[in-house]
């Protein structure tokens, strides 16, 4: 009787690949029946930690992010559908939180930079003419915890006021009994009568006004006696600004006598330090040196009467020089030609004489030999 056969177990090396294949099949089937990570939004976020895969029918909940709040009863959850996609939803139910309304300041205006009071936006403030801003010019809508609040208190517009303008010696200004001046209020200065024979002159701007920064538009003027010396010019005379006394801003115009020209400005003005500005000019005699030829006419647009004559004389001189050179060249050429002709004729005559002498000598020698 044959012994019973043994049952052999499959080799582990063969079992491991089978288990791995089965696991892959199960994993693939489970992945194919799942959804990936749920969608993300600007205004909403998941209430739970996201997972890489979700089963069909699994549900996720959303809530508004910081700085947003629920505005409408829309869906705030999504479900993994049978086609392995998420049920579409929107973050429209969550809107930005807004800062409280700030009205226009009295005598001013509040301007929204982006037309909204939601956090992240700005509110600008400006004042009307005659008022200036006290406080911050720009406020920002910011998040403080979970609330939207402004970055500071709203400013106010206050009326522009100036203190009384300064008083001056030997003079006064209008509205001297007013203690406070408003925006663009103006005062005018004037000088008092002088105790002596010469009057006071007002040096500077006579009128100043209250500006937008609560200061006056300029310094106060000065009242003092300004008197310039009588202007004297040799070899010349005044033609305008005549007078016996010359006070502040007096203007004098000069001209020189015939045969003299002016050195300096022909117009001078008496300035605030009692001197002429620029200084009184001088009249200097016109030089008659032959090296300097004065033009007959200095009026622009009119020709010099001698200019045409000089130009015509220059042209005739050049023409005569050219003609003389041409005549000289012609004479030299003709003389050289005659000289060469004479040399040629003389050479021919000398040759003939020498040939005759040579023939006579030859005949004599022949006779002697015979």
UniProtKB/Swiss-Prot annotation:
Q: Which SMART domains match?
A: CCP
Transmembrane regions listed in the UniProt entry: 316-336
On the tree of life, the source organism's domain of life is Eukaryota
* Entry's localization field: Cytoplasmic vesicle, Secretory vesicle, Acrosome inner membrane
Q: Which cysteines are joined by disulfide bonds?
A: 35-80, 64-94, 99-141, 127-157, 162-210, 191-223, 228-270, 256-283
**Which residue ranges does the record assign to the Sushi domain?**
33-96, 97-159, 160-225, 226-285
**Is Membrane a UniProt keyword of this protein?**
yes
* Main subcellular location of this protein, as a coarse class: membrane
Q: Specify the glycosylation sites in chain numbering.
A: 114, 287-289, 292, 294, 296
Q: How is it modified after translation?
A: O-glycosylated.
The secretion signal range is 1-32
Q: What does this protein do?
A: Acts as a cofactor for complement factor I, a serine protease which protects autologous cells against complement-mediated injury by cleaving C3b and C4b deposited on host tissue. May be involved in the fusion of the spermatozoa with the oocyte during fertilization. Also acts as a costimulatory factor for T-cells which induces the differentiation of CD4+ into T-regulatory 1 cells. T-regulatory 1 cells suppress immune responses by secreting interleukin-10, and therefore are thought to prevent autoimmunity.
Recorded protein name is Membrane cofactor protein
